[in-house]
Amino acid sequence: AEKKPVKVEGEARQKGDAPCMIIFCAFDQQMYLIELAKRYGLNNYINLVFRKNFSAQVLKANMKVVGNCEYGLILYRDRLPKFRNNGKMIFNCIDWPRDNESEKIHPTQKPVELLKRLIEIFTDEGDVVIDPCAGSGSTIVAAERLNRKGFGFEIKKEFYTKANQWIMEEKQVKLDVKQFG
């Protein structure tokens, strides 16, 4: 039996205000995730390619062409998701800036600046951003910097502890700025 899509209460009814889900994944995971998403009513998608000017495969550089891309999907229901592009064209191939500022907490940690850009495009101030695989907490830090409500989940205690510390430091900096600013 085919699973019926879950109806989300309070889901946006206006054009351009619907939520979306962004998933980072390996290239070969995309079709599986698209099919899985359809079971839950996320019938539409846009492929994303994140282009790096560096590669983790540096030791293989003399043996073969090395990968410098990460992949992702924007998943959404039937209405186009909220899209705040300020009249600028947004391509599905996005530059991945190297993050030399943030402490490396997690092996697949995403750059805060990249996450901020995605959050700015698909949310407004005060919106909720959820990261079900929070890892380093960089998505929550990015959301916090943009005045969004961030919620993250992490099952590994070592990552949770470090991520939580980073998020709390970020919130403290924000409080200090508000208090003295």
Predicted regions and their residues:
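Core catalytic lobe of class I
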Residues: A1-G152, K156-T161
